Design a protein with these regions (language model features):
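Active-site lining segments that contact anionic ligands and/or coordinate catalytic metals
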Residues: 75, 100, 127-132, 151, ...
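Single conserved hydrophobic/aromatic residue that forms the stacking wall/gate
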Residues: 1-10, 212-215, 219-221
Length: 221
């Protein structure tokens, strides 16, 4: 979600994968600090028919930003990888597809938790600029992405868990708040899969091979 035009590029790539008849797709948003809100909305729209993607609350009121394209580019299994460094537009993409029940989110205990919009105001050539928080992002389920971020459906232990990363680590971070949910229709196609997959993930982490791998990874870092 870092540059303009990514939505069109991603749409072509999704079509290429469909042509190859892939059994599923994984979107890796780990270490993705965000980017264009417009692109995040367009990418989310590739996986749903239509509907709201994110709510933006500012001084003038509330905007509900939708996916305007009723076409679905891909309807198959979808996983999104996140970690504590997934922030801003990345969190919006993950949150929207989680709220719709369209993707399974996998990763750290939570994403970064940056649910605010900043605007630069010039103070003149000699005085520089002032960065002000002017708006906040809200999921379509009504919860903010601020502070708490997005909690994955399946949590995988990470070295980042012991690091002070995320909005909640800041001394004066803005709080998590809620607003009224947007009107949207959630799919229940993956609801029953998540407990099963989560249990399987825990079982794999309890194997000797996984413990051995983690020991070597910790020693490396």
């Amino acid at each position: 979600t870092r540059s303009r035009g990514l939505g069109d590029v991603y749409k072509r790539q999704v079509q290429d994968l469909k042509d190859e008849e892939v059994e599923g797709m994984i979107i890796d948003l780990r270490n993705n600090g965000g980017g264009s809100l417009v692109e995040a909305i367009e990418i989310a729209g590739l996986f749903i028919k239509s509907g709201p993607i994110v709510q933006v609350k500012e001084r003038r009121g509330l905007q509900v930003l939708p996916d305007a394209d009723p076409e679905i580019s891909y309807e198959g299994p979808l996983i999104i990888l996140v970690n504590r460094l997934s922030a801003s537009a990345s969190e919006i993409l993950a949150a929207a597809l989680q709220d719709y029940g369209r993707a399974i989110i996998v990763g750290d205990e939570h994403t970064h938790g940056k649910g605010t919009v900043q605007t630069l105001m010039s103070l003149g050539e000699k005085k520089g600029s002032l960065k002000l928080t002017t708006a906040g992002f809200y999921r379509i389920n009504g919860g903010s992405t601020q502070l708490r971020g997005v909690r994955p459906d399946i949590i995988i232990p990470s070295l980042l868990d012991v690091m002070e990363i995320g909005e909640k680590e800041l001394e004066h971070a803005l709080p998590w708040t809620t607003i009224r949910p947007a009107l949207y229709r959630k799919s229940n196609t993956i609801k029953e899969c998540i407990p099963v997959l989560s249990a399987q993930s825990i079982d794999r982490r309890n194997t000797v091979s996984y413990t051995h791998l983690r020991a070597h990874e910790t020693a490396y870092y």
